Amino acid sequence: LNGWASVVRDLGGLIFIDLRDRWGITQLVAEPEINPELAERAKHVKTEDVVWASGQVRKRENPNMRIPTGLIEIVLDDFGIINKAALPPFEICDDVELNEDTRLKYRFLDLRRPKMQKILLTRNKFYQITHRYFAENDFVEIETPFLMKSTPEGARDFLVPSRTYKGKFY
């Protein structure tokens, strides 16, 4: 698995990491009795660090029915920190209300929130279905400046002079 460390808990040496990826939350467990070196490394994981993990799936002793993967956990065989992260300015969850300025300033974090992930995945699925339909029905996709929308980021439009209508642009 690869993802962000959403929550890290140290319960007397037993380390729990809630790994968040595009599919949701999966609990990882580092047990010092099984692998003390691995448990020691897991202590250094902080919120929003990017991590990879491999291990054995087992049934949880205390299921968490609030999440789809709440019946299982991954007992770590190995893991690593791909990238350390600074403490984010807000918690990456849907429960936190953010004003628009904060959301736009930290757009890269806002897009990690489950609600935003769901919107992106739904939009992606819509585009895939639409493209597939048009391709299967022999439509030709064209992208011209005339048909493309302007970007909201403030980039200038690319003007294309018309050969047919002198002094006019697309």
Residue ranges and their predicted role:
Residues 2-170:
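Class II aminoacyl-tRNA synthetase-like tRNA-binding/catalytic domains
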